Amino acid sequence: MLNTSTSGGSGVHVVLASSSSASVNGLKNYYIAKIQEKEIVLRDKIENLRRLQAQRNELNGRVRSLKEELQQLQEPGSHVGEVVKVMGKKKVLIKISQEGKYIVDIDKSIELKDLTPGVRVALRNDSYALHKILPNKIDPLVSLMKVEKVPDATYEMVGGLDEQIKEIKEVIELPIKHPELFESLGIAQPKGVIMYGPPGTGKTLLARAVAHHTDCTFIRVSGSELVQKYIGEGSKMVRELFVMAREHAPSIIFMDEIDSIGSTRTEGGKGGGDSEVQRTMLELLNQLDGFESTQNIKIIMATNRIDILDPALLRPGRIDRKIEFPNPNELARLDILKIHSRRMNLTRGINLRKIASMLGGASGAEIKATCTEAGMFALRERRVHVTQEDLEMAVAKVMKRGDESNMSFKKLFK
């Protein structure tokens, strides 16, 4: 009996020990889970705090900017003037429209080297002290005229105009790239050139090629864009056009269809519209006289009717060279054909010289249209190559002429 009771007591001790160790493990796991739960909550709180701090910083920045804007709005207005001449280290001559000219003080924050003639500035309302330099005021329509991307045209894309390329290089490209040559000779740089001739002879293409090779800011404007509805708007656009050209020098101003504003003036005018056009042309003449040839601003004009232009616009000193663009001769037509057909899939035995002889009196644009039409004839017959007959039919279609014995002409118009 004693032995039995003794063994039973040891069993009870074993059960109690195992149950106590299980409870300890359970408490340990419980607190580990609680700690992990609190760590997750803590991480969420930290992320939320960081997000709130970022929002606080953003709102503080907005408050500061609004305070600065409010302070600027509460400041008294300033007079707007234009720098005429720097009179010393602390004085400058300013022109204010409707009021006249004043010699004013310069604020300490203004650099004297930035005060060049023509710069717009702000003057304090009470003391007339110069305290801010303003950007030049340019019409958005004028800003759109500037070609940001350099044109991709090159001299190799211009065919049959070797003499014209040489002349425009001397007037436009050489002064921009090598002004020291003109200084060593003691002669003034040319200001501009006018290109005239029938439509489609390559005037615009050559102007784009010049801008490509000189790496200049290319500002293209049509003369009709300067004809505005209201009085003074056209003259204002001309002034701002030259202001933008000075800011982005070296620059080339290409004025196409100049005859729309540069026609010969008549006595007394024919009406309000003609008077406004004449005022625009007078402003153009004033701007051509107002800039020096050394300012790296060159003018290229183009027209189909040089006979109706005003002599004042064409005089030397404003336009220094007149370049004629006639319709190409047979050799030039052959060069243009080779340029436009170099990427075409032509069959063997194509006689381009014969096509050039058939295009008598055609312009460069008509020759290009001939190559395009020849390709269209090939597409119409579901071919991937252009034949001699396609080119001859294209000539007949573009030039609208042919004889009854020409089989390709009969095939086109049957």
Curated annotation (Swiss-Prot):
GO terms for molecular function: ATP binding; ATP hydrolysis activity. ATP binds at residues 197-204. SUPFAM superfamilies: P-loop containing nucleoside triphosphate hydrolases. The 26S proteasome is involved in the ATP-dependent degradation of ubiquitinated proteins. The regulatory (or ATPase) complex confers ATP dependency and substrate specificity to the 26S complex. This is 26S proteasome regulatory subunit 8 homolog. PANTHER family: 26S PROTEASOME REGULATORY SUBUNIT. Coiled coil: none annotated. GO terms for cellular component: cytoplasm; nucleus; proteasome complex. Keywords: ATP-binding, Cytoplasm, Nucleotide-binding, Nucleus, Proteasome. It is found in: Cytoplasm; Nucleus. CDD domains: RecA-like_PAN_like. Its main location: cytoplasm. It holds the Pfam family Prot_ATP_ID_OB_C. It comes from the Eukaryota.
